[in-house]
Amino acid sequence: MPARWLLLLLALLLPPPGPGSFGRTSTVTLPETLLFVSTLDGSLHAVSKRTGSIKWTLKEDPVLQVPTHVEEPAFLPDPNDGSLYTLGGKNNEGLTKLPFTIPELVQASPCRSSDGILYMGKKQDIWYVIDLLTGEKQQTLSSAFADSLCPSTSLLYLGRTEYTITMYDTKTRELRWNATYFDYAASLPEDDVDYKMSHFVSNGDGLVVTVDSESGDVLWIQNYASPVVAFYVWQGEVLRKVVHINVAVETLRYLTFMSGEVGRITKWKYPFPKETEAKSKLTPTLYVGKYSTSLYASPSMVHEGVAVVPRGSTLPLLEGPQTDGVTIGDKGECVITPSTDLKFDPGLKGKSKLNYLRNYWLLIGHHETPLSASTKMLERFPNNLPKHRENVIPADSEKRSFEEVINIVGQTSDNTPTTVSQDVEEKLARAPAKPEAPVDSMLKDMATIILSTFLLVGWVAFIITYPLSVHQQRQLQHQQFQKELEKIQLLQQQQLPFHPHGDLTQDPEFLDSSGPFSESSGTSSPSPSPRASNHSLHPSSSASRAGTSPSLEQDDEDEETRMVIVGKISFCPKDVLGHGAEGTIVYKGMFDNRDVAVKRILPECFSFADREVQLLRESDEHPNVIRYFCTEKDRQFQYIAIELCAATLQEYVEQKDFAHLGLEPITLLHQTTSGLAHLHSLNIVHRDLKPHNILLSMPNAHGRIKAMISDFGLCKKLAVGRHSFSRRSGVPGTEGWIAPEMLSEDCKDNPTYTVDIFSAGCVFYYVISEGNHPFGKSLQRQANILLGACNLDCFHSDKHEDVIARELIEKMIAMDPQQRPSAKHVLKHPFFWSLEKQLQFFQDVSDRIEKEALDGPIVRQLERGGRAVVKMDWRENITVPLQTDLRKFRTYKGGSVRDLLRAMRNKKHHYRELPVEVQETLGSIPDDFVRYFTSRFPHLLSHTYQAMELCRHERLFQTYYWHEPTEPQPPVIPYAL
């Protein structure tokens, strides 16, 4: 139980609040002990310390207010204490922590930087007089005014301070950046052995877990809908801060062993799963989150398995980090604490800073704790203000960038601190003794203007005349090239060596741009020497300086052993991986010292290859879509380098001795569907999904493999706003895997994305049945598809897993395309749920319908056909110890699905209080417990899931159902009181 001990250790290390924190005031008697929770949206919740339930809420302005219209975000503020982080300096060194906060900047203002930026700060205090019983604001006290106050004995005085920092550019006369930070007046935390609670807060949302500091038990869990920034208790006459720990939401769920909807009191009623020692250690990070339309930063603790951006990294590439391994549950569902091994781009590598700033939202996530910057506070006042030597920073010789608005400087070579006055003396000594005369300055400006005018006129003339001469030269070269090309074709027929004309070989730009000789795209860069051919055979003698083509074969060499090199792609012709349609051959090759698969495509298919490459570029950032590297061309072929894979899905299923390497069938299907959902989100229809086009990757560093969708040759990119495509260009796909609407003459509507869902349904059955097809043998498949004659005999109606799989596959291969679910619907289906999630779903359903009327729409839907689900009387189908225990407390109806779910929920909640024989018959929670019921009532999960679709829009059930963004909201079914 390392996770539980770790949480207890963290709770003990928290500095607890001072004495008198439980309900003591000098003039007001608290009706109950309160805890005050401040959230990022400006709310102050008065909550019960015992349960965390909200008694009342005071709503004010958000804790942070930063501009949203600036092109580049200058700083990331911390809502916990007003700390500031920069997004990088001159060298894009990533996030950097500044050694001062917004309140400290306000304290130091007014000040001015050397590049003309004025800093202005404002601090405004305000007092709120609050009715302690209702939370109503009775009076507001500020320096401007004070309302009248009615006398009361239960009043609470809360002070709040507003810090505003503004930066103004004197050159552009525009506001550069500003921020407002609010904080409640409170004393600092103190040691208090009587305070027995520790608070853990998740980053990015309002989840709070309060733990008993001594036992480590979870006292209560609440979600306050906005990130929590501070906790306070009432001591004497003022608030006093209580220390809390910010934790990643994945880590918090891991530590408390929770999943699904939170918001109820939960304690550890069963031990944690066995985890490695390393995974139980928490690491400090910096979490960058988003509130409204702006970013903020906050310290956060994470456990091993949470992806962390390395220190000094800037934004990752758009294709995302490289994933060497992902921990996924046995049933295809990501576990609560996924373990990933991510490799981020170490830097921008020459990418423009503009693109970096436009994509700064990609910073959201956990980063390694940044280094602190060595900075100096600028305190140079404008000329019309009184100057003091210690407050003046002279103009710097270098123009400071926007990221250095607060004058971020490196440490001196001897690592000794330099004071502001010393810096002033050094720079005054280097300053010129006499300013430049105004007349000399005007003469220099006039000379500059005249020279610039002449240069501009000459440049315009060059731009006008140069394209004409270049166009004439290109026409002559093109005519000459056509003549030489005719010679090539004639000499190739006679198998004679060809010597191109000297003028052509002397023009590298012509060779690089003409096309038939060389073309690189994707991640491949042009050849360093444009004169060198991009296609060569090795071993072979080097090309002669006269321009002999090295791609022609030498009579004394074995063709099968030559290494073909085209640009950055190389391969050996004997390493054939497979053959495709239209003469396509796939070789094992190399690209940038990486093993790849090389597709060699004939000229007749160049247009299809270009379309495939374009679609690969758009979609390959997903881990379950084949990765594309580059494209090269020579005179005869086009070559596409893609990710090298170990096998196809067909080999995975049909070869009995195939090493699965931990990739279970349901996990494989989940990954395939995830890749398909990604394609559909990009308006791409695959149109040829089959086992042969689903590839399995090479094992990663952890020995794991994953499924990837490949072969984009028949893909269709739909225009924006379109959801269907025409059949006029033919019927794409492979016989036996084509949806019926593609071939049916009776179908008047154009096909849609659902053709892929049909093919995926066939693939699902193929994997689960270990090689069978829902529409029979290969010769009759397509005919059976048109007739709708499917056969799912491998599924048994008395087996829970088969019932769930059959229900999903029947929807996916439905004859009516509109009845098929989307890929995102499929991913939400119980087919992929873990046993833990199944149990949580049953519990949430029981909670939802507990007080619903028997004649209400939800209960009626749940009980419709329910007697068959519970086998007429579920009480007669459970073991005797459980029957005996159920009779002790309440009466259950044996023919009611609702009562069966209620019994499951009650026994799960009171599992530790059950007799030993009942615990033994139910088994451990959650796996054995949920199997106990689903094995006896195999249709229970499927029936309940379909019945509760009425509530799919409710927040409680959004984890279990998917609804399209454009789907109309159904009428709200209110909770029964």
From Swiss-Prot:
<dbReference type="GO" id="GO:1901142">
    <property type="term" value="P:insulin metabolic process"/>
</dbReference>
<dbReference type="GO" id="GO:1904707">
    <property type="term" value="P:positive regulation of vascular associated smooth muscle cell proliferation"/>
</dbReference>
<dbReference type="GO" id="GO:0042803">
    <property type="term" value="F:protein homodimerization activity"/>
</dbReference>
<feature type="binding site">
    <location>
        <begin position="690"/>
        <end position="693"/>
    </location>
    <ligand>
        <name>ATP</name>
    </ligand>
</feature>
<keyword id="KW-0834">Unfolded protein response</keyword>
<feature type="binding site">
    <location>
        <begin position="643"/>
        <end position="645"/>
    </location>
    <ligand>
        <name>ATP</name>
    </ligand>
</feature>
<keyword id="KW-0805">Transcription regulation</keyword>
<feature type="region of interest" description="Interacts with hydroxy-aryl-aldehyde inhibitors">
    <location>
        <begin position="906"/>
        <end position="907"/>
    </location>
</feature>
<dbReference type="GO" id="GO:0036498">
    <property type="term" value="P:IRE1-mediated unfolded protein response"/>
</dbReference>
<keyword id="KW-1133">Transmembrane helix</keyword>
<keyword id="KW-1015">Disulfide bond</keyword>
<comment type="subunit">
    <text>Monomer. Homodimer; disulfide-linked; homodimerization takes place in response to endoplasmic reticulum stress and promotes activation of the kinase and endoribonuclease activities. Dimer formation is driven by hydrophobic interactions within the N-terminal luminal domains and stabilized by disulfide bridges. Interacts (via the luminal region) with DNAJB9/ERdj4; interaction takes place in unstressed cells and promotes recruitment of HSPA5/BiP.</text>
</comment>
<feature type="binding site">
    <location>
        <begin position="577"/>
        <end position="585"/>
    </location>
    <ligand>
        <name>ATP</name>
    </ligand>
</feature>
<comment type="function">
    <text>Serine/threonine-protein kinase and endoribonuclease that acts as a key sensor for the endoplasmic reticulum unfolded protein response (UPR). In unstressed cells, the endoplasmic reticulum luminal domain is maintained in its inactive monomeric state by binding to the endoplasmic reticulum chaperone HSPA5/BiP. Accumulation of misfolded protein in the endoplasmic reticulum causes release of HSPA5/BiP, allowing the luminal domain to homodimerize, promoting autophosphorylation of the kinase domain and subsequent activation of the endoribonuclease activity.</text>
</comment>
<feature type="transmembrane region" description="Helical">
    <location>
        <begin position="446"/>
        <end position="466"/>
    </location>
</feature>
<dbReference type="GO" id="GO:0043531">
    <property type="term" value="F:ADP binding"/>
</dbReference>
<dbReference type="GO" id="GO:0033120">
    <property type="term" value="P:positive regulation of RNA splicing"/>
</dbReference>
<feature type="modified residue" description="Phosphoserine">
    <location>
        <position position="729"/>
    </location>
</feature>
<dbReference type="InterPro" id="IPR045133">
    <property type="entry name" value="IRE1/2-like"/>
</dbReference>
<keyword id="KW-0418">Kinase</keyword>
<feature type="binding site">
    <location>
        <position position="599"/>
    </location>
    <ligand>
        <name>ATP</name>
    </ligand>
</feature>
<dbReference type="GO" id="GO:1990597">
    <property type="term" value="C:AIP1-IRE1 complex"/>
</dbReference>
<dbReference type="GO" id="GO:0035924">
    <property type="term" value="P:cellular response to vascular endothelial growth factor stimulus"/>
</dbReference>
<dbReference type="GO" id="GO:0005524">
    <property type="term" value="F:ATP binding"/>
</dbReference>
<dbReference type="GO" id="GO:0004519">
    <property type="term" value="F:endonuclease activity"/>
</dbReference>
<dbReference type="GO" id="GO:0000287">
    <property type="term" value="F:magnesium ion binding"/>
</dbReference>
<feature type="region of interest" description="Disordered">
    <location>
        <begin position="498"/>
        <end position="559"/>
    </location>
</feature>
<dbReference type="GO" id="GO:1990604">
    <property type="term" value="C:IRE1-TRAF2-ASK1 complex"/>
</dbReference>
<protein>
    <recommendedName>
        <fullName>Serine/threonine-protein kinase/endoribonuclease IRE1</fullName>
        <ecNumber>2.7.11.1</ecNumber>
        <ecNumber>3.1.26.-</ecNumber>
    </recommendedName>
</protein>
<dbReference type="GO" id="GO:0004521">
    <property type="term" value="F:RNA endonuclease activity"/>
</dbReference>
<dbReference type="GO" id="GO:0001935">
    <property type="term" value="P:endothelial cell proliferation"/>
</dbReference>
<keyword id="KW-0325">Glycoprotein</keyword>
<dbReference type="GO" id="GO:0070059">
    <property type="term" value="P:intrinsic apoptotic signaling pathway in response to endoplasmic reticulum stress"/>
</dbReference>
<dbReference type="GO" id="GO:0046777">
    <property type="term" value="P:protein autophosphorylation"/>
</dbReference>
<feature type="binding site">
    <location>
        <position position="711"/>
    </location>
    <ligand>
        <name>ATP</name>
    </ligand>
</feature>
<keyword id="KW-0547">Nucleotide-binding</keyword>
<dbReference type="InterPro" id="IPR010513">
    <property type="entry name" value="KEN_dom"/>
</dbReference>
<dbReference type="Pfam" id="PF06479">
    <property type="entry name" value="Ribonuc_2-5A"/>
</dbReference>
<keyword id="KW-0723">Serine/threonine-protein kinase</keyword>
<feature type="topological domain" description="Cytoplasmic">
    <location>
        <begin position="467"/>
        <end position="977"/>
    </location>
</feature>
<dbReference type="GO" id="GO:0006468">
    <property type="term" value="P:protein phosphorylation"/>
</dbReference>
<feature type="site" description="Interacts with hydroxy-aryl-aldehyde inhibitors">
    <location>
        <position position="892"/>
    </location>
</feature>
